[in-house]
């Protein structure tokens, strides 16, 4: 009950909570091994995106957030790569886990995403790769770190950078330009393998800066 109450409070404040050591340390090597087994089905990409996953607008200034495109690199392993008996699938579909998430999010129910590709994914960042600043199109995301990088790759977010009523382009421009006001709004999470993160990213800009060029894959 204390864990759920703390998660609810943190989500209400800035849309992010972390449950430390959610996955047992003794389970992590097996999960990491499973990722290695299905890694040949990794889909990698290298594109430039703005925070809104939209096209630019020539009627706006060149440094407007809509016209600010930054490299997004990395890859993902889609759900159809997993074996039906996968340990990841077992956790993902566990009714107790779904009930726990709904309690933390303070919603009546949470259901598994039915998309055969995006329902359950492994996100992979190799040396020198990054996820650029962006807003999510979904209401929330649930992520668990399996393998961390030795350098870089820490999750950064700017809580409530926009709202359902206003885009706050000026505020996002501060973040993108790394100006003092923007930097002051950014929080950094140092996640460790086994940590579970619940994040409401629709209105909170976030990114994963570059993984160190000599680091292992995150």
Q: Predicted regions: what is each one?
A:
Residues 17-21:
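Short, well-ordered beta-strand elements within core beta-sheets of diverse protein domains
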Residues 1-2, 12, 22-96:
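Non-heme Fe(II)-dependent double-stranded beta-helix
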Residues 23-25, 147-149, 162, 203-205:
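Short, solvent-exposed loop/turn segments at secondary-structure junctions
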Residues 81-89, 98-196:
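Catalytic core of non-heme Fe(II) oxygenases with the double-stranded beta-helix
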Residues 131, 205-212:
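Short beta-strand His + acidic residue motifs that chelate non-heme Fe in jelly-roll/DSBH
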Residues 156, 160, 210-218:
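Non-heme Fe(II)/2-oxoglutarate
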């Amino acid at each position: 009950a204390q864990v759920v109450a703390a998660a609810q409070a943190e989500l209400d404040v800035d849309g992010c909570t972390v449950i430390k050591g959610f996955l047992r340390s003794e389970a992590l090597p097996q999960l990491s091994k499973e990722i290695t087994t299905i890694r040949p089905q990794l889909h990698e990409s290298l594109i430039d995106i703005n925070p809104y996953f939209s096209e630019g607008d020539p009627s706006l200034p060149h440094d407007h957030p809509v016209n600010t495109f930054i490299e997004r690199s990395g890859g993902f392993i889609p759900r159809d790569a997993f074996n039906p008996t996968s340990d990841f699938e077992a956790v993902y579909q566990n009714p107790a886990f779904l009930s726990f998430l709904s309690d933390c999010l303070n919603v009546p129910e949470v259901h598994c995403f039915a998309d055969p590709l995006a329902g359950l994914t492994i996100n992979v960042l190799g040396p020198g790769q990054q996820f650029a600043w962006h807003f999510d199109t979904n209401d929330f995301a649930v992520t668990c770190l399996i393998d961390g990088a030795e350098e870089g790759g820490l999750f950064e977010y700017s809580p409530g950078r926009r709202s359902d009523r206003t885009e706050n382009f000026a505020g996002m421009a501060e973040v993108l330009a790394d100006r003092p006001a923007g930097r002051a709004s950014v929080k950094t999470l140092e996640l460790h393998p086994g940590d579970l993160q619940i994040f409401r990213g629709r209105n909170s800009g976030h990114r994963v800066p570059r993984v160190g060029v000599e680091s292992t894959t995150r």
